[in-house]
Amino acid sequence: MNVKEATNAHDEHQNGLAVPEAKRVPKERTFHGDTFIDNYEWLRDKESQDVRDYVAAQNRYCEQRMAPLASLRKTLFDEFKSHVQETDMSVPTRMDGYWYFTRTTQGKQYATQCRVPVRSADDWDPPTVEADAPLDGEQVVFDTNVEAEGHDFFRLGGMDISKDGRWMLYGTDTRGDERYDFRIRNLETGEELPEQFNGIGGACFTPDAQWVFYVLLDDAWRPYAVMRHHVGTPVSDDVEVYREADERFWVGVGLSFDERSIVIGTGSKTTTEVLLLSTDTPEGEFRAFIPRESDVEYDVSFSCFEGAGENGEDIPLAVVYHNALNPNFEIDVIDMRTHEPPYKLGEGVRVAVGSPYGCEHGDDVEPGASSMPIGTPYSNPCNPAILQGAHGLGIEGIAIHRHFVALQYRAESLPHIAVMTKAAAAEDFLAGRPWRFTELVPHALEGDWDVDESVDEINEERAEIWGKLDALAAAQGEGSAVHGISRKAMTSSDGATADKMPGETRR
């Protein structure tokens, strides 16, 4: 008797239940010229009654074997649950004419998505949401608890809302296989349009909600193609607008933060590419912003220096985050008035450059860099003063908001955020000098982080951050331009935000 047989015999004696044994059904399988016998190929057929019976037997055995631990299991569950604040809410985020936020309620399994109308066009101060009290004018956008009724499993797999706040495109998974079924709902009437997009990977609206772009999945769950749908027409008439033939790459689609482009992002572990199409011509052809290069990752977002041109005109910007010239990434800002597509990596003004030291391809940047310690101080004439001499410098993203700019980077293995006013950034950009960032250090990070802070203490720290931004604005000749209006940047996705693929979206 071998060890497995002895263990099974012991379990059968102790529990009175035989350990389920999967039957062997030999099947030859050949790959790359090699043939082997797979005795359990039959288990792949999820619809087979034999498979269902075997899984049920395994479940019965597990339940009986684990029965003595039922009390401990409940104790652990209750302990974990006691550390969770069940009745809670998220920080409101403004999108177009509404503040959106999420509520969770004690005793309910799922969250509820809510919103309230903004008070005015200049309302950038998020409302104070109380856990147990609805706000004036509060609307339920999506109650997952109601939607989940009658399903053994339910997951909300994405939500996009039209610019006028009337239409919602949402996806649900009721099988647990991460293939989502998307529908379009009228938020004013609750009625749903007849078209359905079943078993897909994700979807997005155009700003006017007249078009839907969605991603197809192959048999391996790889998102590989993008389809275009005209709202109000049969799904059978949908058009394929992009297909990724290379199985190493996945595909995503979304809307750019400036809402002027539909973005297709495609990438592998080491290579990415972004394709764009103007929302003014949704039936047009997607074009690569920068053609794909092997082992080069990049992302792009768009912003604008309003009124900063010589004659008071706006300066449209493309903000490119890439590792084509530096293994620890860099950020380039392109003046789109003076550059034309197809763009090239390395065009524009270099705003922040990471350290090549200790990196595999560091020698491409500086001879001998790859053999140097990763913590060697690094300086680059393009970098802001606060980055000069940084140890282990890595650039992680930039966000150009309505009134200020935030730079995210890593030094000495720790994350950092630096800020400056947008007006000062425009001056530095046009003058061709390093940008004058100042590091932003919240009070909670200066000493011990108290996780039991009261709401008043948190508000005090928040006010302190605004004060630092005010001081920064004053130092850069902007008076108090940041105070009161820059708060939007902490709660919404205006302008360019942290870089991520595939295809950044505003939702």
Give each language-model segment a name.
Residues M1-R507:
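Beta-propeller folds
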